[in-house]
From Swiss-Prot:
PANTHER family: HUWE1-ASSOCIATED PROTEIN MODIFYING STRESS RESPONSES 1 (PTHR31624:SF3), UPF0472 PROTEIN C16ORF72 (PTHR31624). It comes from Mus musculus (Mouse). One of its GO terms (biological process) is negative regulation of signal transduction by p53 class mediator. Homooligomer. Heterooligomer with HAPSTR2; the interaction is direct and stabilizes HAPSTR1. Interacts with HUWE1. InterPro entries: HAPR1 (IPR040308), HAPSTR1-like (IPR029196). This is HUWE1-associated protein modifying stress responses. GO terms for molecular function: ubiquitin protein ligase binding. Residues 172-181 have a biased composition (Low complexity). Belongs to the HAPSTR1 family. The modification Phosphoserine is found at residues 167, 212.
Length: 275
């Protein structure tokens, strides 16, 4: 009996945090420290996630294939020759887009699983480290304040505790309604960097003017341009098509705006109408 009493007193002797836990509690803590290591599979995934260059390079390569296949499908549709089937270009584009989607979903799921596992382990590690630093008896408000990341209320005050929650700064999202066009710069860069024509990758289609080399005028020259499309490389063809459609859209917007200004703001027009 005396030996058991001495062992119990030695286990709960309060000379330091290491003496606050019983033998069973120390065994649980030791097992928890051993479980902090990830499984071999998750360790490989975590090592790959720590160096995302390989995954990003693979996704970028798949995106290049998808962009090139879609652009080739559009070119073959515009420059379709009699008796030429569009099934093969369509099949290539569908396959490239499907591979890009599958790889993106798999990468996201693996990263999500690793994040959850690491989050659980980090939470347990933080809570156990906090418990080791506390006394044998932990107050309820101390535990809740630690888990919620708040300051515990004062213990001597009789008034109900007031928790001041500082709301985080809400970043105001500024949406620019002036430009409704989709940014297709990554799409054009993917086509240009696919080995077709790297010189056209940095040209901005939206900033092209009627005097710039990328501007394509509509009218009789359009038919002449389409007759020679078979000799144009894919990147140049897509760049000219985007410039043509974007410039035509901008011209229509500017024309309608100018007409509205003339009707509403011109004093000569108002004077003639009154006469």
């Amino acid at each position: 009996m005396e030996e058991r009493k001495e062992e119990g007193e030695a286990e709960i002797q309060e000379h330091g945090p290491e003496h606050w836990f019983s033998k069973w509690e120390r065994q649980c803590l030791a097992e928890a420290e051993q479980d902090e290591q990830l499984s071999p599979e998750l360790q490989e995934e975590a090592a790959a996630a720590a160096q995302p260059e390989h995954k990003q390079q693979k996704l970028w390569h798949l995106f290049q294939n998808s962009a090139t296949a879609v652009a080739q499908l559009y070119k073959d549709r515009v420059c379709q020759q009699p008796g030429l089937s569009l099934w093969v270009p369509f099949q290539n584009a569908a396959t490239a887009v499907t591979n890009l989607y599958k790889e993106s979903v798999d990468t996201h799921q693996r990263s999500f699983d690793i994040g959850i596992q690491i989050g659980y382990q980090r939470r347990n590690k933080d809570v156990l480290a906090w418990v080791k630093k506390r006394r044998r008896t932990i107050r309820r408000e101390d535990l809740i304040s630690f888990l919620c990341g708040k300051v515990p209320p004062p213990r001597n005050s009789r008034a109900p505790p007031r928790l001041t929650v500082v709301s985080p700064n809400r970043a105001t999202s500024t949406e620019t309604s002036s430009s409704v066009e989709t940014d297709l710069q990554p799409f054009r860069e993917a086509i240009a960097l696919h080995g077709l024509s790297g010189a056209m990758a940095s040209i901005s289609v939206r900033s092209s003017t009627p005097g710039s080399p990328t501007h394509v005028s509509s009218g009789p020259n359009a038919s002449r341009r389409r007759n020679g499309l078979h000799d144009v490389d894919l990147n140049t063809f897509i760049t000219e098509e985007m410039a043509l459609h974007l410039d035509n859209g901008g011209t229509r917007k500017r024309t309608s705006a100018q007409c509205g200004d003339v009707i509403t703001d011109s004093p000569t027009h108002k004077r003639n109408r009154m006469l």
